[in-house]
Amino acid sequence: NVTSTYSNGCGIFDISFCSATKYFSGHSDAMGGSLAVNQKVYKKIMFFYKLSGYRMSADEAYLIIRGLRTLDTRLKQHYENTKIIINFLKKQKKIKEILYPHNPSSKNYKLWKKYYSGATGLFSIVIKSKKKSSVISFVNSLELFGIGYSWGGFESLAILQEIKSAKKDEYLKGRQFYRFNKDEFIVRLH
């Protein structure tokens, strides 16, 4: 839910990478990514970089640089719009939970605050419903949101996320994974 703009990745990790396809370009018309490394791994990464031949095309670079010029303004507006939508959704009976770590009522707010300085417009809602078809109808009826997976572009999108199973994994080291009941559905919004 954040871009590298709001995180201090290299202050925490040796390698930080992110998609430049989403918020960086801002128009959903370019594909690329960024990689930032600290001095500890720089030589290894540069060796692989030279060996692999991976390069971004000039057109993709141009489109992403164009988007970077307005990134800060767009992210601030995404966040402001998201606050308005979340405040509206909090009052809806069918909404069980809003999954957005920047929200002070979020279970993960303290953890988010420790590592990030801002937020974007991507969040999910947990809808309580006896029928999946009702949730599909809800998503299809949205007038200001298109249907799709991408985010960070110029349009608002929504998609019903299919949750097959959610279980505790070893790598979580005791942290609680979200548990969903049969009558709960996730809709991702941007």
Residue map of PLM features:
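Conserved C-terminal alpha-helix-loop-beta "cap" of PLP-dependent enzymes
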Residues: 97-188
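Conserved PLP-enzyme active-site core in the AAT-like
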Residues: 1-94, 99
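Conserved residues at beta->alpha junctions
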Residues: 36-39, 129, 190
